[in-house]
Amino acid sequence: MLSRRIIPCLDVRDGRVVKGVKFRDHIDMGDIVELAMRYRDQGADELVFYDIGASPEGRSVDYAWVERVARLIDIPFCVAGGIRDVETARAVLHAGADKISINSPALGRPQLISELADAFGVQCVVVGIDSIREEDGQWRVRRYTGDPSKTQALPMRTLDWVAEAQRLGAGEIVLNCMDNDGVRHGYDIAQLRQVRALCRVPLIASGGAGEMQHFADVFDQADADGALAASVFHSGAIPIPELKRFLRAQQIEVRDGQ
């Protein structure tokens, strides 16, 4: 069994880290580089940066802060936001990112997944999926969630998109459970279990962490490979070293940290 990964998520807007609830009402959480260095020192396994305005605004990520982060941390990090083609992805990786993540652009042009996998290898290609439960009880995909005024509800079922993304070459899936985002009531175990049943690549759970037991639950009950969280880390409610000690005490294998 591979070690489970603890992954702080940093949503970036206008050069700052922000955090919202259910992808809305974002507040400032601090400087990108300062937070990245804090999590490096605390023993995070990797970091994910989402430039949440890039896709809705039709632009690419700001390479300057990617380069600054790469110079100062020695843990893997993934960058998402406005990556629509191989050239942009190459620039992000050249700036120092270890992986790139695509979400809305892949929904508009699914072949982008294959193009990136062919160019850089599947290990570099993460597909993020923003999923919400609709009135009919089905989980469906949304895009442009970084800007509530531009968010689009799509008819595609989440499970169908997970299967298609893998077929096209996704090397990892990050499932952002929008109903649970920022509310700290726990991960969406029911949805994650369904996705896990058909997901052959690493699955990262996102949305809902509020206490240490929630991390244990998502590893034990949904068999997630990693758990991504934001507000509980940014606020200091859950220090990563304490979280790892807690998980080890429950016989969950995690990488050594502080």
Swiss-Prot record:
As one GO molecular function, the record gives: imidazoleglycerol-phosphate synthase activity
Q: Where does it reside?
A: Cytoplasm
Q: Which UniProt keywords apply?
A: Amino-acid biosynthesis, Cytoplasm, Histidine biosynthesis, Lyase
Q: Which Pfam families does its entry note? A: His_biosynth
Pathway listed for it is: Amino-acid biosynthesis; L-histidine biosynthesis; L-histidine from 5-phospho-alpha-D-ribose 1-diphosphate: step 5/9
Q: Which residues does UniProt mark as catalytic?
A: D11, D130
List, alphabetically, the CDD domains matched. Answer: HisF (cd04731)
EC number(s) from the headed UniProt entry? 4.3.2.10
Q: What is its main location?
A: cytoplasm
Please write the reaction equations for the catalytic activity of this protein.
5-[(5-phospho-1-deoxy-D-ribulos-1-ylimino)methylamino]-1-(5-phospho-beta-D-ribosyl)imidazole-4-carboxamide + L-glutamine = D-erythro-1-(imidazol-4-yl)glycerol 3-phosphate + 5-amino-1-(5-phospho-beta-D-ribosyl)imidazole-4-carboxamide + L-glutamate + H(+)
Tell me which GO cellular component terms the UniProt record holds. cytoplasm
What processes does the entry annotate via GO biological process terms?
L-histidine biosynthetic process
This molecule's function is given as: IGPS catalyzes the conversion of PRFAR and glutamine to IGP, AICAR and glutamate. The HisF subunit catalyzes the cyclization activity that produces IGP and AICAR from PRFAR using the ammonia provided by the HisH subunit.
| PANTHER family for this protein | IMIDAZOLE GLYCEROL PHOSPHATE SYNTHASE HISHF, IMIDAZOLE GLYCEROL PHOSPHATE SYNTHASE SUBUNIT HISF/H IGP SYNTHASE SUBUNIT HISF/H
Query: Which NCBIfam families does the protein's record reference?
Result: hisF
What is known about its subunit structure? Heterodimer of HisH and HisF.
Similarity remark = Belongs to the HisA/HisF family.
Record protein name field: Imidazole glycerol phosphate synthase subunit HisF
Where does this protein come from, organism-wise? Xanthomonas campestris pv. campestris (strain ATCC 33913 / DSM 3586 / NCPPB 528 / LMG 568 / P 25)
